[in-house]
């Protein structure tokens, strides 16, 4: 028997991270070795921990999902002895209509951790969980928390009584499957909780795709225990395979996980069925010989297509590149059509649970397939398809057919507000700067859904490897040279393709080299990263070659605007949502996210997060709009969480309202009203002139004309340096004024050998309002702290506050934030700029509750507001949210050298 305290602690950690973690990430949170942890998980069994494996040619990644046998009693009034929890499930999730003062009106108990409930939790070894952690665990373990299942639903392909108008709002899935007691290995009812319609209903009831994914994996595990795989019965004793509709990880289309991937030969012996979305009006798989299906399984192993991230628990889809698989294509009615010859549905490898100490490596099912892969796929594809494996919405297809977009002009098209003309130019760049971008290798690529509405390429890694891989965005799988569309494009664009384009089978990193951008890479030709003259790079896949676009700055400018998702380039249309140029995949290479690098890193990508209001306007998080209270989270905070947990859900507040933001679904949900808003993540635009200026040195003043043209066209640049709209007032204080005396004395306390030239007061009502609101929330007085920086940043700071992306110091050992000093001399000595061009800001800073910092921190630990160098008598304060800071004064000073008599 596993140690109850250890199991409870592991469950607590998992629930604090959304109910699921990669095994490697879990090992970092506990003081156990890997063999010890594996033994605990095995002894505890799948009723406590479901262990999943995602495998590929690069290796195996294991994930752990928390579950429990504890259940909530469904009776309104339970008078008899009961081993279940008695509580209000809506209150547990923070959604009960009765407030705390009205809890007596609710039919269910609001005492989550009552004495009776505590006994039940103790019996299930869960007494150490708090309310929030218990909510996570029960939500993915107890089917009582799921929406109602339709009682009229009889299964796919059978006569259904359910014909409600409007369509049924209940779940059409197997009720027994959710309870873990379905006795049919080939059940006629659907076991696919990741079906589009099911997900939509789940979302309406507050269950985001992350939670549904965990429920799917837990139910799959129970079903495998109930129906262990064995020798297949004769066909006469099996149900018609055409109507099977279960989802055992391999049947997931948008995400999924594979539990202990088996070999192809073993998998071929098990039933391999399509999901409910695929099987209507199709021939039975019984018609296809087993040997033929087995051969097709082996052919699908190592094609030039994507596989799910090895760091996640998503399904290894052997059918193609998208999470839906290239063996399917979505038609306008939402159905899917197979691209396999003689196969009426997609085929997936089956998998079995094995004991933790005996986790086995992948069987080599990917060998000897390259020469035969063309026999699996149809030689022709519909023109409406964006690429082989890149699915395209009917909206995108219809839009491209519109004659208004197929102009010779280069223009950016805003979906609702018309078009914005931009200078025309050739489609591709002949003279791209930098070495060839060898973005993919002979192994398959990894794809995952992104917050930008498309997919990203990521290299095989443990749970949360380098963030740069998340910023390389692309769709579609690698097209074969024999694709007839490639020849068509090559005929028309052969004279403009780049000579430095990269082959898809080259080996290289997806990350643009920061050293090359800043001061020159010391590794030169041996550097594994991409060398390019901009922190972003746009390319299009033609055949097996990634070709650079010309005028990348113009494409980037459109992409950075959250309201723009289509732009036309000559006779071609770029769709930022699906990352395609007509029927060809495109991608955006990028530098790493700014929150993952030290504060003094230059040219990292700063991502901005937006939500869409009722009028269709994209609002930046943390920004006040239409006199509404701004949210208590901003882009830097969200980006930090996204980089550490890209499948997570973030709770936050805006005024008195509570919300949840799902990274995977990119949806913001009002917890009370259940209304949802779209969310998007786009980078801050960095013009080429700024890159050149930073290479020359940050003290060089930029051309003022550039900022006018940029801010007039693109709203996302409000946080970008030098793009100020003069929304502040800077006034010099007279040297006899008491305010001048107070500030100067504070400055000279540590700067005795320096002379003050001027002290100017900053007045910015917008920044002051945000600071005042934050101050009222934290209920504390601010400290007067110092921050030395380049004179070139005065306008940016006065207008938009401090920014760790641009206004950096050499330090980062206490966290990746903004460094303020108690003594001015400390900030002066740590300023990385020429002393002749340095100014000193005096800021009001809300340090709040602080703890000792760490170089890995991108935000303060929970329950803390800032980080310091030492807790006893701190002299350095690291702030991660700029609303905790208000720049109040700026001091111009020079060194007062002593007179020397010779």
UniProtKB/Swiss-Prot annotation:
Residues 221-251, 265-287, 299-373, 445-481 are annotated as: Disordered. GO terms for molecular function: cadherin binding; RNA binding; zinc ion binding. InterPro entries: ARTD-AVP, Poly(ADP-ribose)pol_cat_dom, WH-like_DNA-bd_sf, WWE_dom, WWE_dom_sf, ZAP_HTH, Znf-CCCH_8, Znf_CCCH. Residues 235-247 have a biased composition (Basic residues). SUPFAM superfamilies: ADP-ribosylation (SSF56399), WWE domain (SSF117839). The modification Phosphothreonine is found at residues 273, 393, 554. Phosphorylation at Ser-275 is essential for sequential phosphorylation of Ser-271, Ser-267, Ser-263 and Ser-257 by GSK3-beta. Phosphorylation by GSK3-beta enhances its antiviral activity. Residues 265-278, 310-336, 344-369 have a biased composition (Polar residues). Residues 716-902 form the PARP catalytic domain. The modification N-acetylalanine is found at residue 2. A motif (Nuclear localization signal) lies at residues 69-76. Induction: By type I interferon (IFN) and viruses. Isoform 2 is up-regulated by 3'-PPP-RNA. Residues 594-681 form the WWE domain. Residues 224-254 are annotated as: Binding to EXOSC5. It comes from the Eukaryota. The keyword Cytoplasm applies. Thermostable. The N-terminal domain is sufficient to bind to viral RNAs and promote their degradation. The second and fourth zinc fingers are involved in binding to specific viral RNAs. Contains a divergent PARP homology ADP-ribosyltransferase domain which lacks the structural requirements for NAD[+] binding. It is therefore inactive. PANTHER family: POLY [ADP-RIBOSE] POLYMERASE, ZINC FINGER CCCH-TYPE ANTIVIRAL PROTEIN 1. Homodimer or homooligomer. Homooligomerization is essential for its antiviral activity. Interacts with EXOSC5. Interacts (via N-terminal domain) with DDX17 in an RNA-independent manner. Interacts with EXOSC3, EXOSC7, DCP2 and DCP1A. Interacts with PARN in an RNA-independent manner. Interacts with XRN1 in an RNA-dependent manner. Isoform 2 interacts (via zinc-fingers) with RIGI in an RNA-dependent manner. Interacts (via N-terminal domain) with DHX30 (via N-terminus) in an RNA-independent manner. Belongs to the ARTD/PARP family. This is Zinc finger CCCH-type antiviral protein 1.
